[in-house]
Amino acid sequence: MPRRAVEQVNMAMILAGGVGTRMGAEVPKQFIRVLGKPIIIWTLEILERNELIDAVEVVLVGGWEDELKAIVNEYGLRKVKWVAEGGPTFTLSVYNGLKYLKGKLTSEDIVMIHMSVAPFVTDDIIEDAIRVCKEKGNSISENPCLLCMGSHDNDEYSTKSVLRETITGLNTPQTFRFGELLNDYEIADAGGYLEDLEPHTTSLLYHHGKRLYFSKGSQLNVKITNKDDLDLFEAYCLMRQRRGEPAC
């Protein structure tokens, strides 16, 4: 893998370990086709075109390795270098992906974690994530809260507001130096509490007292979870095509 002189390698870890039960489809949702193309390919093509991304690792649901290989070859994606097996949660999939990268990256190389079913990500979001990580040591794509917020008293009602200025949405990409992030996971694994935490990388780092730095986000950068999200993404692609822009 080519390396820039002096600089770190920028590697994207794409999480594709889910099965998409909420979608009710016959295939994992990352393989559902939108305008004839699998969602994961829409996402990978953005990384393929981005000049700052050097390589891609896909952390994949078991049993779909041959399908991934076939469509990566079909669409000529050269940056996909590695495939690791996904885990049952976000954080365990990340850990599997990190362990697979041992010996392939240096401790100072950059790992940008993103979801395979979040194809709305843009070049400016990716580039700001990498910039902030290199300056501060990590970055989390931020989605500020725009709605009025309230806390749950129970499942039926709320009696208290929450100041939206005090909270924010933590989205992907989430970007880190490889060695430091792997060390955080290994400490938690050895301590026996990795699976006791809320299953996200941000929860682990908060538990370790880390300060997380915000990078650029977008209200449009959503994870495709249900059929409404699929319709939204298809409409977005068609709109861009009508403008003569890359569909995604």
Where are these regions (language model features)?
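Hydrophobic helical membrane-anchoring modules
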Residues: 221-248
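Residue-level signal for inorganic ion chemistry
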Residues: 14, 40, 97, 115, ...
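N-terminal glycine-rich phosphate-binding loop and ensuing alpha1 helix
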Residues: 2-66
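Conserved core of the sugar-phosphate nucleotidyltransferase
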Residues: 120-215, 248
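Short aromatic-hydrophobic micro-motifs that form the base-stacking/packing surface
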Residues: 110-114
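Short phosphate-binding loop-to-helix
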Residues: 73-109
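Acidic metal-phosphate-binding loop of nucleotide-sugar-dependent transferases
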Residues: 21, 116-120
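Hydrophobic C-terminal alpha-helix "anchor/cap" residues
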Residues: 44-48, 72, 101
